[in-house]
Amino acid sequence: EGKALVADAHIPNGPYKPAGLENYAYNPNKARRLLREANWDSSIELDMVYYYGDQLTVDLMTAIQAYLADVGVKMNFRRLEGDVGAQLWTGASDPSGPAVVKWDLAYGAHGPLALQEYYSRYETGGISIAPSPADKKLDQMIGVITGTPDVQKQKEGFFNIAKYMQDQLYTYPLYYQQAFIYESDRVNRNGGMYGNPQYNYDWGITNWTTTPDANGKMIMRTNTGPIEFFEHPWFNPGLFIANKVLFDRLITCDGGLAPTRPKMAKHYSLSADGMTLTFIMKENLKWHDGSPLTADDVKWSIETALKVPNLMPNFKTTFSSLKGAENFMNGSASGISGISINGNVLKLNFAKVDPNVLLSFSQFAPLPKKHLKNTDPVKLQQDPYWQKPIGSGPYRVKEVQMNDYLVMVPYDDYHEGRARIDEIIASPSNDNDANLIKNASAKRMDYGFTKNVADVKSLENMNHMNVLPQNIPYTRLIWFQKFRKK
């Protein structure tokens, strides 16, 4: 419908993508021949999972099921619910398996923070979609694109890995999409910028206003509120409204995700060789319970994040590049030696260059050590803290009823000033809200974003809604689970 492009690689069209990639057009005769040559057992039934709640996704699953049946492959599909991240991405402890996840095929999307993240998640020992057995050639290619700040070397590396991944077909890219921000005519950003809505940028939320109601209160209604728990911010740092406004970051970036200025830090500096990053944190930072937010919270958060199973690959690359990270991870050290604290000065010394280190810290939200220090990092998402989290951002939780509503109000002691909108009310949903059009039609939706084309067309027909397309790196794919089953 004019709002998507056919994909022939993970990476979107642009200077980092080579020409002439195989696009694997549908060819049932060739598929049948290859299945015969592979002695495919037609009694096997593949389990395909997805996590979107819209009818278009169900229709797509039904179509894929029919295409597979036509060539002699059985497939059933089901929607994941609950801790979707763990069900999708928990990796096997051994590169030879067995698998921890229960699915064979998964449909979803990847909208990475940095282009390297399209591929770094396939590194041996990583999440569930890493090749099994291990692919050392791929690991070396990942090392090239994640290990140099040299743009030309990165470009050559992306050309090589894009072609190799498409030749090996470890994952099947389907199409590229824009994101569409929607806002009601009640919302005024008052000069705040627009950008990639899946991540955090300097959007000036504290200065937004809405048309006051009959009581003079400014309320903004949105979605992506919690269903069973608040999603932790270390895998999808800006996908959910709570992760955008309940938590804060050391630095911020522009709408294109280029780091621009300090946030919780009052100053930061990266050495010319990229090996030392220094933050001077603001004085009197506070968590929403009034307790101090310190450099020790940041250090603890970095160390804890490295042990969380579903950690954003960009964060993992940055933190594992620190001096002493390897010893910390293998248990031979109690902390990461490359992190040092002197009062409100946090210094990070790296063993190797990470070209996206500032980008990582524009998205990484420290969590309160006080409330989570006794939690097993492997089970971070299951901690009771995520029923009503205490954050550091411009809004705090006032009231929440899981799978019903979330009310957030300004945090009076926020270090960049009290936010002007009196309440943000979020209805429960994942990033694809099945109730979006119903709520928008009833004028109960003021802000959000979507990639659902049918929803975009409906919103564009509502006089009180504005739709603003944003170009983002975002690819819909089918992932293949390659580990042996138990």
Language model: regions and residue ranges:
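Ligand-site clamp/hinge motif
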Residues: K74, D383-W386, Y411-S458, P473
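Aromatic- and charge-enriched surface segment that lines or borders ligand/interaction sites
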Residues: H267-N314, K347, A442
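A structural "hinge/loop" feature
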Residues: Y182-N200, N223-I241, M264, S291, ...
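N-terminal lobe/hinge region of extracytoplasmic solute-binding protein
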Residues: R221-A272, I390-G391
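Detector for C-terminal structural segments
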Residues: E1-A19, Y52-A66, T90-P226, G238-K244, ...
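Alpha-helical secondary-structure segments
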Residues: E1-D8, L34, I44-Q55, T148-L169, ...
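Surface-exposed binding/hinge segments that line
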Residues: K299, F315-N374
